[in-house]
A protein has these predicted regions:
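Short, well-ordered alpha-helices that flank and scaffold nucleotide-derived cofactor binding pockets
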Residues: 19, 23, 67, 94, ...
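Short acidic/histidine-rich motifs immediately flanking catalytic phosphotransfer sites
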Residues: 46-51
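Ser/Thr/Gly-rich flexible loops in soluble cytosolic domains mediating phosphotransfer, phosphorylation
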Residues: 3, 75-102
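N-terminal glycine-rich "phosphate-gripper" loop used for MgATP/nucleotide binding
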Residues: 54-63
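Short glycine-/acidic-enriched loop or helix-start segments at secondary-structure transitions
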Residues: 16, 62-65, 88
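Short acidic active-site motifs
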Residues: 38-42, 61
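Conserved active-site segments centered on acidic
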Residues: 2-39
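P-loop/Walker A phosphate-binding loop and immediately adjacent motor/lid segment at beta-alpha junctions
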Residues: 2-11, 63-83
Length: 102
């Protein structure tokens, strides 16, 4: 199962995108769990994640998170700004699949 964790300041805007990503995964026949959290909650959920997606507004925290949680082996990815703004779940899912493939 693909467990995608989205993180933003409060989890609100990413909550909408999480639903779109889950729908895209369902359309592709991929079993997934897609959840959104505030970055303050990341330590509590990092060990359940296949990948952590950061909202574009948290791009400045990428290095901090990679250093803090690097030992988990969970990859991080910044969500494309255009896909985030348009709530394009399919594009984000495709980027996730590409990232975890490599």
């Amino acid at each position: 199962m693909l467990n995608i964790v989205l993180v933003c300041n409060w989890g609100a805007s990413t909550g909408m995108l999480a639903k779109k990503i889950a729908k895209a995964a369902e359309e592709k026949g991929i079993e997934s769990n897609v959840s959104a959290y505030s970055y303050d909650d990341l330590a509590e959920v990092i060990n359940t994640a296949s990948i952590v997606l950061l909202g574009p507004q948290l791009a400045y925290k990428l290095q901090e998170f990679e250093e803090k949680f690097g030992s988990t082996g969970v990859p991080f990815m910044i969500i494309n700004t255009v896909d985030y703004g348009r709530m394009n779940g399919m594009n984000v899912l495709n980027a996730v699949l590409e990232k975890i493939k490599n």
